[in-house]
């Protein structure tokens, strides 16, 4: 069967284990599998262009070329991959062994083994036997069983089941001497070392067992042969089963079903599952008293800080936390392995301050408890995890620092430097030990890496290395300037100690020479004079200060406490953000302190900044800035007054200024942003959790008193109803009290309003059927899904049926049917269930509407279980919209909070085990029970379902629960007569139906007996019957429990410290497992309105602008419909300002008109809004400040005017430099670029115009309309001009050149260049695989197509909005979209450096060569840099010479797009983007789908490009190459495989180092080595340093991609995702997943 092409990474994973060694050992097996795949792939054809490419086929087609091109290094790598195949012997080797009388095991094909095993013949059975570890020959299972039966085993012999490590095992008697076989037996693990001898220890072959012992065994056990046969079958079956699981299921499937080996270990280990999962990342926690005390101190400080941020309270409760309680919690958690729910329920006495214990005093004994979210416990739990990870990191860094220091010490011979290094190392280790936060550890790490930069440690020979980029600090240090830096005075560490007042430093001694005189001694080739030496030394000192942990801690303290943030709108933002916009409340913030940010406000600011709608500035107020500078000067400058002291102080001031402004303050701003993001996410996560808590802590629907039968706790019978538009129809589902489906009814005509006779008859029939349906099943409540306004009519129709039933058949109606409630239920969760995998497993035969209705009814019966149902492996619960800003949270963050909430609430509610054993949907919360998890819960569930029911709690141990897990879980698992146990007469302990833990049963029994003795005035026996009688007595008479004075009773028993435990016992004896959840409440009118309309308080409010469609006109008013289906009423007087003069609205409007109105008022009960269209009202912003306004909100009109004035001046400047031309041609006009795009805006695709160029009088520009909003500009160079005067220059040249083509006049340009180009453009636009839309929109279409055809490689073409004039070929092979660029030329389409006259040929080539690496020669670094765009088209500017400009060698398109700027204005307004109901249901009247989205600035992941030049956005150009010109380079061009500038340089999507790169390859390793300039050299007109790096050195620091022309200062390290010293950032590497030769297929790295 055909399969999708897989990446090289996937192949490596399949062939190699962690050590790089192949996993599958049988070479024949690999060869056979390859043959099978080749045979299968012969018949593959492309079907509907969903093609499948096989890597092996492609490799065979170009095998000869590959062999010629493979370097020695690549061949060595391939040889390593095939290593396992070579370990088998050839037939000649086997013959040679036979000739030498050597016994051996000849490998068989895997398929032959399997066939022999299935046939059961002797040969097949023996193939699975093991070798005898003593004799060297095969040992049968029979021998092994005999050993076990008769104890005939040598004590010194190893176990028989130890696997052999070698393929050849030689018998001593046959082989002879050891030396004879030395050449045959080689240890396969020591590939490069000397051969090892085969059997270093010779053993004799077992001769057999004693006959007498065999006879005795036969008499005892029967025929041993029979036993052997059974065992052989069992072994074969087990082996086949293991193979079946691993071979027939994908690893993801096994992982999802918790069937991996690791899952099995978790199930078996007697430690709570969630603890095991946590410890996989944190490691085992320390359990000694010192460690627990140290951690509790740290957690106490962190917790106090968090509570202080919340104004000193938590949830409005002003309680204090006891540090000893934290230590006790850690002991219970880590030492005794108890989870939070258990501690909160059964260990209250040991950590009282962590709980709100107000409900547990004697005065509140009779009060019903409420469910509580134990937030403090969970905060401590999270801090505990942070502490363990911090401790783990510190230990790892300590080991690394020690190793690195020792290696550095061996390389340095200068005694002074050795002493300095030792001092620095000891200082770093000391700082590391006292570091208390991740940020402080980062500071220590920064200091260590500054003084001990990472070298090539741990890099194996021959391994690819990232080109190292030397920092200015390292250059200065190697030049010996560290000695000069040490002469400035105090060291960075001394300054830090002085600032933090930890240590008083000695007074500074002034030098006896000037700084310049001292610097002369260090002049060298790199630093040619004393000024250069001082500048370098000052840089070193400033960097050291900025990396000193104590200095950073001091500056951080001031900055984080006092820094302020201001926001203002950009020009686009001012247009887009109106009074109802998401960013309206943060549009103008003035100097808001960091500590005043609440909730998720900062996340909105961050989003606004990313979308270029807001400008954000951080600032340290002037008084605090002056204080900071003053403190630094005070402790760093000399107090001397001599000339020398003053000169040295001038140098020190420069150092401090550089340290603060160039390093520390930018670093602090970055930290402040990170801190605000972390805080905002934490608070948003808490709000998200609170929203979920409110849902799951709500109790089920309660039956009315008259409906209560013998089982008071039985859930109500529910008739669930889902509205349907006709296909599917209205659906009614009847659920019994266990949530199982009893009956289903479809009634499509029930809500019909037609007066047609036939329709009326169908409606009457449906009413009768619904009536009979309800009469037959007697529901307690009707659950109606609230999805749109039609549901209100459906509710009325159901009530009509109920009234008819009560009137016509009162005797047949059950109690309460005349008062039957119809309850609206939100359909958002049921819709998730309808489309989930679990619904397909639970209700496989039912339709989607039925599944949704089942979820509606079950949600009324048991909200907790219904929510937990969607918390399975699919995690559908994460799609439940609970918070308007939840999209800012990662899925893992959300699920962590979901798990926390579900664990807390589930254990307070408990689970009825016997009921769940009969109805598996009740088992869904089981994974959240204390001690369990998805793996242990699934195992327990299977065991309980097999048993059917359970009668004693302690029997849970027999169902796979270990002792520790049982202790955690037992109190929350309820054992009662339900499910199958309801019909059993077996005894059930009443205490098992309470929350009383088994460890407290004796206390409960003693209390019950004491009360019983008191009531009956006698002393009963202590036998079980008497105790049971006492428990029944107190349970039947709760009043007797309330008489107990708890304090006196505890004093009499001397158990004063058990008050909370006894309170729990009394409560549970009164009413076991009482439901503590909030009682069910029907939705309020407001809630019903928002559910049915699909609106929220934010999307519909008075003053909001909406669009309405006129449906009907009446005298004096127009009846309209909003997008949500709400009815809008527009009165005549509200239509316009002169409305009183309008006689009839019909004269002004007609049906179908779309109006833009403002909401005047809302009538929620009638689902109506009143609208107003008056122009004066539309301009009025009186509703703008109705919402809560931030205290720091101050609108700055002056700033706005400056923005507008700047934009106006830029336009004037363009017009000022515009020079008209004296050219007469129908296709030429004297207009600017903006005017040209405006002129072409309403023209057809392919229309063009020639205009003057902004480059001067020797150029023209051809502007071509590619698509709506996409225009390309092609430069035309004029030649043969006479430069006599301005008039001759304004005339057209004698020759016109575009790229390498020359034309005589504009007519020839049109005929030979433009017309063919337009023809090819229209061919592409009309091609069957062309898709309109942006890159992301096309990707979404592809994902949908991929979902429908998962086995195909789907692809399509689209317009490149980022690079006008090119097309994008997008395709998906597995999951992620990949992109390649196609150039548009008059000769055709250029793809991967090949020209194609028509698209079909291009497609055929692409399908055959989808995985081909780009093998052509690579251009120089400088030629590539000339083609790399330094600004996006939306920025309307070139990048200082190259960028988007055109080319003289081939010519370059330049492009701009309408998709930026004010063209986006207003897209956020009026509820844009609401194209449907939040629950996912369709709108009854349709709706609009307005919205806006924005991709990342450099959304070029996995992209290749072959353009035809430089598709830019400005009129400026450069002297060299365009995209993919003759000079090479470009995206996906010949930038691979060759060495450039001393290193092997890869291109974008090229082959970097020799293997394929699927559009995400690295930029090559070694690029720019040997001083060959970096990417972005000369960018922005400034020369970059010779150290490489993308735009490195421009403007004093390396520039990141997307920075302004490389000329502005960026981080000192630069590079895309790169850090100082070439380290990986974000844990995954830089450009294209490290500069190794593996293919990066969206698997981690990339841009």
Curated annotation (Swiss-Prot):
Signal peptide: none annotated. The keyword Repeat applies. Residues 21-30, 132-151, 1496-1507 have a biased composition (Basic and acidic residues). Its main location: nucleus. Residues 1443-1647 are annotated as: 12 X 2 AA repeats of [WG]-[GW] repeats. Residues 7-20, 31-67, 152-191 have a biased composition (Acidic residues). It is found in: Nucleus. SMART domains: S1, YqgFc. It comes from the Eukaryota. SUPFAM superfamilies: Nucleic acid-binding proteins, Ribonuclease H-like, RuvA domain 2-like, SH2 domain, Tex N-terminal region-like. Belongs to the SPT6 family. Interacts (via N-terminus) with IWS1. PANTHER family: TRANSCRIPTION ELONGATION FACTOR SPT6. This is Transcription elongation factor SPT6 homolog.
């Amino acid at each position: 069967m055909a399969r999708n092409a897989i990446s090289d990474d996937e192949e490596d994973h399949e062939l190699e284990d962690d050590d790089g060694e192949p996993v599958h050992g049988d070479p024949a097996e690999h060869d056979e599998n390859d043959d099978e795949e080749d045979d299968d792939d012969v018949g593959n054809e492309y079907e509907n262009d969903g093609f499948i490419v096989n890597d092996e086929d492609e490799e065979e087609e170009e095998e000869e070329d590959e062999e010629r091109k493979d370097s020695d290094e690549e061949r060595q790598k391939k040889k390593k991959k095939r290593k396992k195949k070579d370990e088998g012997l050839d037939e000649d080797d086997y013959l040679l062994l036979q000739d030498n009388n050597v016994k051996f095991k000849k490998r068989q094909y895997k398929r032959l083994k399997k066939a022999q095993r299935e046939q059961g013949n002797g040969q097949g059975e023996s193939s699975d036997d093991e070798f005898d570890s003593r004799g060297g020959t095969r040992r049968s299972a029979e021998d092994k069983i005999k050993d076990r039966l008769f104890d005939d085993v040598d004590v010194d012999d190893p176990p028989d089941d130890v696997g052999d490590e070698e393929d050849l095992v030689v018998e001593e008697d046959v082989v002879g001497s050891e030396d004879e076989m030395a050449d045959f037996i080689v240890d396969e693990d020591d590939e490069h070392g000397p051969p090892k001898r085969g059997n270093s220890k010779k053993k004799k072959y077992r001769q057999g067992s004693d006959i007498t012992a065999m006879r005795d065994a036969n008499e005892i056990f029967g025929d041993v042969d029979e036993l052997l046969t059974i065992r052989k079958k069992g072994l074969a079956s087990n082996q086949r089963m293991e193979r079946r699981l691993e071979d027939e299921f994908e690893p993801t499937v096994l992982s999802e079903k918790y069937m991996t080996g690791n899952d099995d270990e978790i199930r078996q280990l007697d430690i709570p599952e969630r603890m095991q999962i946590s410890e996989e990342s944190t490691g085992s926690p320390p359990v000694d008293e010192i460690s627990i005390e140290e951690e509790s101190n740290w957690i106490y400080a962190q917790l106090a800080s968090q509570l202080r941020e919340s104004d000193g309270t938590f949830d409005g409760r002003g309680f204090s936390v006891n540090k000893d309680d934290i230590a006790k919690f850690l002991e219970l958690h880590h030492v005794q392995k108890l989870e939070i729910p258990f501690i909160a329920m059964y260990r209250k006495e040991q950590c009282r301050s962590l709980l709100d214990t107000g409900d547990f005093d004697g005065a509140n004994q009779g009060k019903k408890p409420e469910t509580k979210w134990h937030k403090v416990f969970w905060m401590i739990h999270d801090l505990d995890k942070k502490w363990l990870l911090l401790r783990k990191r510190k230990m790892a860094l300590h080991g690394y620092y020690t190793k690195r220091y020792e290696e550095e010490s061996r390389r340095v011979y200068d005694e002074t430097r050795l002493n300095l290094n030792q001092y620095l190392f000891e200082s770093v280790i000391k700082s590391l030990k006292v570091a208390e936060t991740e940020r402080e550890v980062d500071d220590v790490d920064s200091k260590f890496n500054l003084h001990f930069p990472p070298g090539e440690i741990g890099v194996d020979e021959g391994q690819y290395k990232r080109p190292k980029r030397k920092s200015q600090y390292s250059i200065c240090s190697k030049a010996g300037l560290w000695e000069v830096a040490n002469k400035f005075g105090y060291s960075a560490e001394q300054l830090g100690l002085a600032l933090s007042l930890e240590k008083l430093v000695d007074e500074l001694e002034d030098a006896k020479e000037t700084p310049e005189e001292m610097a002369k001694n260090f002049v060298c080739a790199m630093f040619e004079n004393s000024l250069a030496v001082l500048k370098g030394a000052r840089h070193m000192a400033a960097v050291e200060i900025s990396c000193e942990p104590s200095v950073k801690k001091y500056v951080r303290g001031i900055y984080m406490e006092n820094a302020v943030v201001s926001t203002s709108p950009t020009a686009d933002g001012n247009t887009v953000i109106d009074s109802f916009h998401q960013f309206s409340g943060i549009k103008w913030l003035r100097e808001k302190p960091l500590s005043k940010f609440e909730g998720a406000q900062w996340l909105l600011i961050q989003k606004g900044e990313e979308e270029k709608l807001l400008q954000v500035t951080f600032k340290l107020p002037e008084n605090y800035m002056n204080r900071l500078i003053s403190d630094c000067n005070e402790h760093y400058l000399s107090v001397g007054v001599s000339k020398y002291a003053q000169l040295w102080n001038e140098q020190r001031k420069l150092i401090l200024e550089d340290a603060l402004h160039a390093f520390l303050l930018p670093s602090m701003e970055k930290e402040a942003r990170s801190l605000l993001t972390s805080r905002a996410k934490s608070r948003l996560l808490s709000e998200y959790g609170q929203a979920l808590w409110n849902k799951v802590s709500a109790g089920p629907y309660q039956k009315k008193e008259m409906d209560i039968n013998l089982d008071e706790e039985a859930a109500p019978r529910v008739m669930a109803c889902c509205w349907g538009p006709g296909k599917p129809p209205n659906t009614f589902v009847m659920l019994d009290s266990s949530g199982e489906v009893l009956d289903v009814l479809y009634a499509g005509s029930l809500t019909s309003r037609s007066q047609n006779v036939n329709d009326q008859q169908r409606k009457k029939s449906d009413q009768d059927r619904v009536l009979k349906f309800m009469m037959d099943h007697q529901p307690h409540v009707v659950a109606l899904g609230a999805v749109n306004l039609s549901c209100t009519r459906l509710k009325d129709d159901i009530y009509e049926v109920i009234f008819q039933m009560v009137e016509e058949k009162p005797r047949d109606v059950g109690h309460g049917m005349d008062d039957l409630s119809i309850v609206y239920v939100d359909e958002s969760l049921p819709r998730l269930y309808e489309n989930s995998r679990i619904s397909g497993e639970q209700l496989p035969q039912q339709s989607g509407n039925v599944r949704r209705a089942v979820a509606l009814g079950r949600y009324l019966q048991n909200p907790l279980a219904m929510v937990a149902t969607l918390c399975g492996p699919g995690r559908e619960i994460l799609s439940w919209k609970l918070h308007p800003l939840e999209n800012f949270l990662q899925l893992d963050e959300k699920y962590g909070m979901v798990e926390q909430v579900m664990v807390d609430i589930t254990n307070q509610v408990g689970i009825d085990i016997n009921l769940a054993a009969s109805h598996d949907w009740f088992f869904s919360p089981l994974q959240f029970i204390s001690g369990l998890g998805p793996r242990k819960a699934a195992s327990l569930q299977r065991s309980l379902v097999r048993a059917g029911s359970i009668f004693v709690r302690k029997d849970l141990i027999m169902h796979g629960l270990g002792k520790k897990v049982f202790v955690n879980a037992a109190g929350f698992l309820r054992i009662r007569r339900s499910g199958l146990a309801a019909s059993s007469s077996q005894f059930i302990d009443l205490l098992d139906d309470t929350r009383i833990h088994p460890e407290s049963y004796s206390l409960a029994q003693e209390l019950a007996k004491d009360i019983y003795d008191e009531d009956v005035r006698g002393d009963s026996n202590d036998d079980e019957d008497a105790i049971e009688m006492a428990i029944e007595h107190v349970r039947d008479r709760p009043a007797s429990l309330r008489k107990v004075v708890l304090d006196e009773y505890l004093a009499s028993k001397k158990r004063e410290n058990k008050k909370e435990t006894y309170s729990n016992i009394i409560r549970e004896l009164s009413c076991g497992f009482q439901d503590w959840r909030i009682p069910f409440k029907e939705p309020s009118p407001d809630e019903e309105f928002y559910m049915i309309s699909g609106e929220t308080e934010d999307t519909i409010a008075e003053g909001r602008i909406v669009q309405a469609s006129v449906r009907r006109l009446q005298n004096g008013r127009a009846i309209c419909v909003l997008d949500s289906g709400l009815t809008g009423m527009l009165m005549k007087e509200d239509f316009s300002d002169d409305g009183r003069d309008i006689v009839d609205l019909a004269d002004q409007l007609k049906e179908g008109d779309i109006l833009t109105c403002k909401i005047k008022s809302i009538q929620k009960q009638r689902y109506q809004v009143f609208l107003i269209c008056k122009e004066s009202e539309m301009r009025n912003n009186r509703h703008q400040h109705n919402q809560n306004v931030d205290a720091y909100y101050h609108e700055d009109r002056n700033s706005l005017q400056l923005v507008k004035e700047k934009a106006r001046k830029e336009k004037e400047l363009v017009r000022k430099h515009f020079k008209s031309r004296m050219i007469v041609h129908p296709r030429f006009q004297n207009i600017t670029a903006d005017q040209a795009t405006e002129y072409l805006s309403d023209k057809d695709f392919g229309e063009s115009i020639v205009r003057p160029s902004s480059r001067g009088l020797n150029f023209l520009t051809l502007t071509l309309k590619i698509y709506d909003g996409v225009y390309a500009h092609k430069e035309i160079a004029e030649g043969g001009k006479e430069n006599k005067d301005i008039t001759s220059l304004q005339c057209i040249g004698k020759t016109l050149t575009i790229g390498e083509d020359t034309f005589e006049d504009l007519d020839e340009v049109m005929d030979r260049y433009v017309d063919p180009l337009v023809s090819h453009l229209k061919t592409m636009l009309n091609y069957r695989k062309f898709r309109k839309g942006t890159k992301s929109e096309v990707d979404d279409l592809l994902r949908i197509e991929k979902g429908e055809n998962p086995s195909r490689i789907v692809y399509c073409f689209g317009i490149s909005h980022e690079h006008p004039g090119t097309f994008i070929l997008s395709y998906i092979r597995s999951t992620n979209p990949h992109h390649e660029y196609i150039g548009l030329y008059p000769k055709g389409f250029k793809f991967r450096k090949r020209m194609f006259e028509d698209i079909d040929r291009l497609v055929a080539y692409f399908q055959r060569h989808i995985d081909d690496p780009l093998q052509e020669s690579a251009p120089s670094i400088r030629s590539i840099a000339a083609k790399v765009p330094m600004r996006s088209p939306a920025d309307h500017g070139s990048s200082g010479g190259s960028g988007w400009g055109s080319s003289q060698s081939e010519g370059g398109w330049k492009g701009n797009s309408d998709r930026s700027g004010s063209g986006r204005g207003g897209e956020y307004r009026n509820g844009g983007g609401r194209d449907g109901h939040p629950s996912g249901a369709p709108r009854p009247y349709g709706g609009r789908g307005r919205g806006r989205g924005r991709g990342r600035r450099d959304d070029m992941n996995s992209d290749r490009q072959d353009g035809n030049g430089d598709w830019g956005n400005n009129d400026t150009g450069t002297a060299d190459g365009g995209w993919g010109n003759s000079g090479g380079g470009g995206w996906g061009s010949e930038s691979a495989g060759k060495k450039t500038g001393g290193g092997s340089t890869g291109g974008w999507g090229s082959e970097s180092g020799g293997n394929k790169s699927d559009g995400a390859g690295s930029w090559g390793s070694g690029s720019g080595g040997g001083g060959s300039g970096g990417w972005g050299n000369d960018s922005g007109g400034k020369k970059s340093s010779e150290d490489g790096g993308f735009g490195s050195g421009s403007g004093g620091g390396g520039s990141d991609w997307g920075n302004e022309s490389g000329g502005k200062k960026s981080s000192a390290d630069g590079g895309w995702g790169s850090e100082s010293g070439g380290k990986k950032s974000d844990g995954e590497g830089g450009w294209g997943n490290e500069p190794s030769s593996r293919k990066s297929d969206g698997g981690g790295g990339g841009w």
